[in-house]
Each structure stands twice: as C-alpha cells, then as structure tokens.
Amino acid sequence: MTERRQPSLSTDTLPTREAAAIELLSQVCRELDSIVFATSLGAEDMVLTEIIRRERLPIRIFTLDTGRLPTETLELIEVVERHYGTRIERYAPHPDAIADYVSRYGLDGFYDSVPARQACCRVRKLEPLKRALAGQSAWVTGLRAEQSVTRAELPAREWDAANGLEKINPLADWSEHEVWAFIRHHRVPYNPLHNQGYPSIGCAPCTRAITVGEDVRAGRWWWENPETKECGLHRREFAPRQPSAHPAIERDRSAA
C-alpha cells in the first residue's frame, strides 16, 4: 500500500494525543458497559481500531454497510478483520425501505435536492445506526473538530440526546497530520482511496476526490453548501453529559 504523503511537520504532540485517547477510552470502559465503536473505515477510524485492538478494550466494532460503499472500503473491511483478528459487524438498510426510496426519488435522487439526499441518508445510515446503538451505553466515533464547520465545537465526551447514550470523540482535538503520523508509525492499514485525493470517504456516488486547497470534506456531497453537509449521524443535538447509570454534480466516479 502506497504511503500517503504528508507535510513535514513536528510530531512532538503525537505521544500526548495518543496517551489521552487511550486514557479516555479506558476511563469510559471502566465507567460503562456495552460500548460500541462506529467505524466508516476512514483514516481516523483506523487510528481508533488500532488503539481498541492493541489495548484490548471491550468495545464492539461495527460499520454501516449502506449498499453503496466503494469497492475499496468493502475490501478494507476484510483486510482489517484479517489484520486484527476481529470481526466488524455490519448493519445494512432494510430492502423495503430502499425500494420505497427508489420508487419515490429514483436510485440517484439524492442529487436533486437536500431533502432527497437526507432521505437517502436516513434510510441507508440513520435507521441502521439506530439498530446498532439500541441498548448501548456509549458509542465511540472518529470525529475531529477541524474536519468541518459543523464540527468546530466538538467535545471529547458528550451526551447524545437523540440516541439516549454517551458519545465519545477521542480524536476531537487531533490534527489531520497527527492522524497520518499515527498511521505511518504503527503501520495501520487504510483505504487506498486516501492516496487518490479522497481524505473523507462515504458512499461511492456521494464522494469525489478533492483538489489542492479544498477543505478535507469538500468531496462529500460536493453539490451542497457546507452547512448542510452532514448525513445526520452526527447532527449537533447534544445536551451536557448526563450522570452515568452504570457503576465504576458528476455522477460517475472512476475510483469506485
């Protein structure tokens, strides 16, 4: 796998960042039961997969198989399972819900309007996520504050009122450079699309490569304004952390 090129910057902060992420996850595991990690197999999520498996943390890993993921992402799931000797659970949309969406909007109707795109995300992502989070105490994400304007005020730990559980963001204050320095240092597997100009990878028809100078999430739903570019998985409807109840428009992509 070709190494992704990164700026020549100091990595002095990386050990501190890594230790803080490990401590946060370890603390959450001491306090709560039934913790899950939602991975999209992006670079940040590969950092967390490495930490969770290396530290043997009791955190179950799952992904949302939307039915429209790039081939490279699907192949990476198998690579990760072999590399870490673990299983990534897959949650898929209900076929009837997909059929209803296609009947109303068309297979690629998400290009036509923000409501149509949000409806697709609800069917392919939000409903499967609800099933994955049911009965859990907390979920872990690879979100970083610098990724977009919708994530600028991201805390490391918060109460997810929409889903009724804690949400843990161990990489909230990490930079993109720190993420890639970690991947290089620990030889973590990652999606080859990152080497082709895709810093953020979602469903194949909704992701494009970015050009020099563009925001890291510019390739996600690129036909929309930045303020609407969230699928709803991480919408900002959060309350202060609650006390624990537990003890202790191009439609063709050449790369997909």
From Swiss-Prot:
Reactions performed catalytically: [thioredoxin]-disulfide + sulfite + AMP + 2 H(+) = adenosine 5'-phosphosulfate + [thioredoxin]-dithiol
Disulfide bonds: none
Record note on cofactor: Binds 1 [4Fe-4S] cluster per subunit.
Transferase keyword on record: no
Record keywords: Cytoplasm, Iron, Iron-sulfur, Metal-binding, Oxidoreductase
Lineage top rank: taxon: Bacteria
Identification of the protein by name: Adenosine 5'-phosphosulfate reductase
Organism of provenance: Allochromatium vinosum (strain ATCC 17899 / DSM 180 / NBRC 103801 / NCIMB 10441 / D)
